[in-house]
């Protein structure tokens, strides 16, 4: 029986993994076995970090809103009370948009204040 050295499918698989690991340092981008492990770990972390990014952005929006309300806008209001008033008045605005309005557009904030009070 003839021994077959080259397997086309494995060659393609190895090339694909080594192409994905381009830019990794040292043997992490040169050796298939190591680069395969690094790619698997990188893909795992990229998935979980996309979820973490959403969580951290939501925290940032809430902190911005709360800081603005306590220091500049309302005297004794905090985030919970304002969100509750917005929902009771049936104003369709989410946390992200509200934080962007706070940063960029003061006229809209004062209109919102007049609607809530």
Swiss-Prot record:
UniProt-annotated location(s): Plastid
Keywords: Plastid, Ribonucleoprotein, Ribosomal protein, RNA-binding, rRNA-binding
Plastid keyword on record: yes
Molecular function in Gene Ontology: rRNA binding; structural constituent of ribosome
Listed SUPFAM superfamilies: Ribosomal protein L20
InterPro entries found in the cross-reference section: Ribosomal_bL20 (IPR005813), RIBOSOMAL_L20_CS (IPR049946), Ribosomal_protein_bL20_C (IPR035566)
Keyword check for tRNA-binding: no
Summary of the function given for this chain in its UniProt record: Binds directly to 23S ribosomal RNA and is necessary for the in vitro assembly process of the 50S ribosomal subunit. It is not involved in the protein synthesizing functions of that subunit.
Family (UniProt): Belongs to the bacterial ribosomal protein bL20 family.
Record-given protein name: Large ribosomal subunit protein bL20c
Protein source organism: Euglena longa (Euglenophycean alga)
């Amino acid at each position: 029986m003839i021994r077959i050295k080259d397997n086309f499918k494995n060659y393609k698989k190895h090339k694909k993994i080594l192409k994905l690991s381009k830019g990794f340092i040292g043997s992490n981008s040169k050796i298939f076995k190591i680069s395969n492990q690094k790619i698997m770990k990188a893909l795992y972390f990229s998935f979980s970090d996309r979820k973490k990014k959403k969580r951290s952005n939501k925290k940032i929006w809430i902190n911005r809103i709360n800081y603005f309300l306590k220091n500049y806008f309302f005297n004794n209001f905090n985030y919970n009370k304002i969100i509750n008033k917005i929902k009771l008045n049936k104003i369709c605005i989410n946390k992200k948009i509200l934080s962007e309005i706070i940063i960029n557009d003061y006229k809209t904030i004062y209109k919102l204040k007049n609607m809530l009070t």
